[in-house]
Amino acid sequence: MSLTTVTELTPECPSIASAEVCYLVDDDPSVRKSISRLLESEGFNVRAFGEPEAFLNHMATNPVRLVVLDIWMERMTGMEVLAHLCARSPETRVIFITGHEDRAAEATVMQAGASAFFIKPFDNEKFIAAVREALNQA
C-alpha cells in the first residue's frame, strides 16, 4: 500500500477549519508528491494513495469529503473508482486529473457527478479554487 500522509497546517491559512483532509489517488509518485505539496502549501492535510484499491479499502472505514483522482491508472481507472464512490459515498466530491486530453472521458465523469476535471499540468490557482469549492459543496 502506498500511503503518504501530510499533516502540517500552514499558519498562513487559518480559514481551513481543523485542516481539511484531501485524498489523492494517483499511480505516479512524482504527481502524488507535487500535488501533495501544493495542497499542503494551502493548509490542507493530504492522504495520498498510489493504488486505488488501497484508497477504497481506507474509505470503507473513514469518511471522505474530497478525493483528487487520476483518471487513467494501471490497475483500476478513475471512472471505476468513481463508480465505487457513487455506490458507497455519494456525497464525496471528486476532482479528476489526467495527463491526457480526453474530452470524452471529461464529459463522462462530469456527467457522473465529478466536481472538476484538470489536464496536467494545470493552473495551480484554478485547481486550489476547485478544491475549495468542492469542499464547500461537500
For each feature predicted by the language model, list its residue ranges.
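Receiver (REC) domain active-site loop signature in two-component systems and cognate sites
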Residues: 73
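Acidic catalytic/metal-coordinating carboxylates
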Residues: 50-51, 77-80
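Active-site T/S-Asp motif of two-component receiver
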Residues: 69-70
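Alpha4 helix (beta4-alpha4-beta5 surface) of REC/receiver domains from two-component response regulators
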Residues: 80, 101-116
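Non-catalytic signal-transmission and effector/linker regions of two-component phosphorelay proteins
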Residues: 1-23, 29-36, 125-138
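A Lys-centered signature of the CheY-like receiver
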Residues: 120
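Acidic, metal-coordinating helix/loop segments flanking the phosphotransfer/catalytic sites
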Residues: 48-66
